[in-house]
Amino acid sequence: MEVIPFTHLKDWLSAAEADALLAMLEARSDWTQGRIRMFGREIPEPRLTFFEGDPGLRYTYAHRSLEGQGWTPELEALRDRFARDFGIKTNTVLANLYRDGQDSMGWHRDDEPELGPDPLVVSLSLGATRDFDVRRDADRWTERFALGHGDLLLMGRESQTQWMHCLPKRLRVGDLRINLTFRQVLS
């Protein structure tokens, strides 16, 4: 049996909780399409994002810097629930809105210096079910998770140091997906 540092909790949120959170997030007006640097050139991100976190905390990825301005009550409640239920403390959330199956995220790891040497990531999925692939560095062994509405993925120790992950394009997916990725940024 393979032991991997990812735990998939299906239906972690009830359907009613997931529906209410999805509606609240869809209605936000601060979704932006950032620009990232890849392979020496600047391109639009193939998704929309927003960032929340403790005031003054900075998170930088792909030459894009984000600063925490505080929390909405709904996302703060989730942050507190992760600490209570799993003992995982987080102080930022990066939200990704994938408008349909054309929006994606390439292979990467969340290993920015401000996340520390072996970061944990708590990932909550809402909306359309999408494949989420993880690949181990040592032998390129790959696992696929079908992350659905209300599912939680805990990305544990070594998930960002020994593995990469991606959200591949899926042309048959016509509905949106929102993914909330909670992290602990070191101050």
Model-identified regions with their sequence ranges:
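Non-heme Fe(II) oxygenase metal-center motifs and adjacent flexible, charged/small-residue loops
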Residues: 1-187
